[in-house]
């Protein structure tokens, strides 16, 4: 019997999961790594620490599954997107810490590009907005601020990649420098219509083409692991950015199907088929996956801070000891007591796109308790999701039938019920909640014939629980109206 290994490299931890043919998790390992905050608004990772943590959990997950590396049929990779790494091709060493997707250091550069009237150019070609969130301006910053980097890049000595590229480079012992189309579509450098790096956008951001990875399909055999890592050469066969992998793992394979992932951030994607739909409401158009010559697209809304707000309660305020305690604390009060948290710790993402927004806690009175703050924190995740869905339904001109959910915070029943109440549609939690890793596993397995086709994996999806809306629609509208007032007060707070 053989198995599929999925590498799930996230914003706060590296994970590895072993799946069997029925999509069951046989072994799982996870390791957190450092979050580096050099200044307010700046977020970095040590890329070498990411690699070490990822390799460590791979070995641990295989051991926990009770198998050997020789039993692995294929490896799939899913990753935090946009996070930018540049390394020396000869030594394999990064020239700087990785700049994380949450980092806002290039807000001024985005403003300058916008002032030149270039927003429509980037928007129409990439499906993205000009925002520090994406990789392009991060890469330009590294080339401009690391001594000698630009000259070395132009000489072909440096390699750029998102985290998937960094992992593949290391897994193959430096033999392969590549990224899949879903990750490439998050860089501000990739033309989603042509399916290739865009020469004009590269010129606008002063990016030498020699630094870029090869763009490949999301499901194909890219190469094999170097034998020194796992005592076996295992095919690396599937890659997708974390949110696209979750869309695939949730079997949202028909236009109009929507999933929302509740992780560090919160990310909603709607499958739109083979036609890229450009949003009129500040959503993103992105590549969902590339299978052979077929490219599928999605509309996306990205919330920067979701589960990270709960981590702030734990690490910043110290009102909970573990993230799981937030549900009990929030349940200690009957409602939010008029308290609203806008967790704009790294600005606001879709549909607002305000890099200068900052976090705000509003409605506090002498009677406000830790329970009210905990409840407001959970509710902020649902409010941001509701803003996304409203914009998405308008762009697609199609009302949502159900919302499929995944990610760590979906274990929080209070949050899921409030989400259904606020949206007025069923919220469906799948039996296998590890849908991001599962999507990467499916992509890898399809490449080597472990699963025959999407119809076969489609039969594996099952709902574990459906949360039906129970709140009066007038009450939901009232709550959302107050949320909007709070949102307005957080916007434009930081100085450009």
From Swiss-Prot:
Pfam families reported for this sequence: FGGY_C, FGGY_N
Establish whether keyword Transferase is in the entry: yes
Task: List where this protein forms a coiled coil.
Answer: none
> What InterPro entries does the record point to?
ATPase_NBD (IPR043129), Carb_kinase_FGGY (IPR000577), Carb_kinase_FGGY_CS (IPR018483), FGGY_C (IPR018485), FGGY_N (IPR018484), Glycerol_kin (IPR005999)
Which residues are glycerol-binding?
Answer: 81-82, 133, 242-243
User: Where, by residue number, does sn-glycerol 3-phosphate bind?
Assistant: 11, 81-82, 133, 242
Q: Which UniProt keywords apply?
A: ATP-binding, Glycerol metabolism, Kinase, Nucleotide-binding, Transferase
Q: Name one GO molecular function term.
A: ATP binding
CDD domains per record: FGGY_EcGK_like (cd07786)
By its UniProt entry, which Gene3D superfamilies does this protein fall under? 3.30.420.40
Q: How is its activity regulated?
A: Inhibited by fructose 1,6-bisphosphate (FBP).
Residues that coordinate or bind ATP: 11-13, 264, 307, 311, 408
Annotated GO biological processes are: glycerol catabolic process; glycerol metabolic process; glycerol-3-phosphate metabolic process
Q: What is catalyzed by this enzyme? A: glycerol + ATP = sn-glycerol 3-phosphate + ADP + H(+)
Task: Provide the binding site for ADP.
Answer: 11, 15, 264, 307, 408, 412
Q: What does this protein do?
A: Key enzyme in the regulation of glycerol uptake and metabolism. Catalyzes the phosphorylation of glycerol to yield sn-glycerol 3-phosphate.
Name of the protein this chain belongs to: Glycerol kinase
């Amino acid at each position: 019997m053989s198995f599929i290994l999925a590498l799930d490299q996230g914003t706060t931890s590296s994970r590895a999961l072993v799946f069997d043919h029925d999509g069951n998790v046989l072994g799982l390992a996870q390791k957190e790594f450092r979050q580096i905050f050099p200044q307010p608004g700046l977020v970095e990772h040590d890329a070498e620490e990411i690699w070490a943590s990822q390799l460590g959990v791979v070995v641990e997950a295989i051991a926990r599954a009770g198998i050997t590396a020789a039993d692995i049929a294929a490896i799939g990779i899913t990753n935090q997107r946009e996070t930018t790494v540049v390394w020396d091709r000869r030594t394999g060493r990064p020239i700087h810490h990785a700049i994380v997707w949450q980092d806002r250091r290039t807000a001024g550069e985005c403003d300058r590009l916008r002032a030149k009237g270039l927003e429509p150019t980037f928007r129409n070609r990439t499906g993205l907005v000009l925002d520090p969130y994406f990789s392009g301006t991060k890469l330009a910053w590294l080339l401009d601020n690391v001594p000698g980097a630009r000259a070395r890049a132009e000489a072909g000595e440096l390699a750029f990649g998102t985290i998937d590229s960094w992992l593949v480079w290391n897994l193959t012992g430096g033999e392969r420098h590549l990224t899949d189309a879903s990750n490439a579509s998050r860089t501000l450098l990739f033309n989603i219509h042509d399916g290739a790096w865009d020469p004009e956008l590269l010129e606008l951001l002063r990016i030498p083409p020699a630094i870029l990875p090869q763009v490949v399909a999301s499901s194909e055999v890219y190469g094999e692991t170097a034998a020194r890592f796992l005592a076996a050469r295992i095919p690396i066969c599937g890659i997708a950015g974390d949110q696209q992998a979750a869309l695939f793992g949730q079997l949202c394979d028909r236009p109009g199907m929507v999933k929302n992932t509740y992780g560090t951030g919160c990310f909603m994607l709607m499958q739109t088929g083979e036609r890229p739909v450009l949003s009129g409401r500040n959503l993103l158009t992105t590549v969902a996956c590339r299978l052979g010559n077929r490219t599928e697209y999605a509309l996306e809304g990205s919330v920067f801070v979701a589960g990270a707000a709960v981590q702030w309660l734990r690490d910043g305020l110290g009102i909970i000891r573990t993230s799981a305690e937030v549900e009990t604390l929030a349940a200690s009060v009957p409602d939010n007591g008029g308290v609203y948290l806008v967790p704009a710790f790294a600005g606001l993402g879709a549909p607002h796109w305000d890099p200068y927004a900052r976090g705000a806690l509003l409605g506090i009175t002498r009677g406000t308790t830790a329970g009210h703050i905990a409840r407001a924190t959970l509710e902020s995740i649902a409010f941001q999701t509701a803003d996304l869905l409203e914009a998405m339904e308008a762009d697609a001109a199609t009302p949502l039938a159900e919302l499929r959910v995944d990610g760590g915070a979906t274990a929080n029943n209070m949050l899921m019920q409030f989400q259904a109440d606020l949206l007025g549609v069923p919220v469906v939690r799948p039996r296998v909640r590890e849908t991001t890793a599962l999507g990467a596993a499916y992509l890898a397995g399809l490449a080597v014939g472990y699963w025959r086709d999407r119809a076969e994996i489609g039969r594996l999806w099952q709902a574990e629980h459906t949360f039906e809306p129970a709140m009066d629609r007038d009450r939901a509208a009232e709550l959302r109206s107050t949320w909007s007032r709070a949102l307005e007060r957080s916007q434009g707070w930081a100085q450009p």
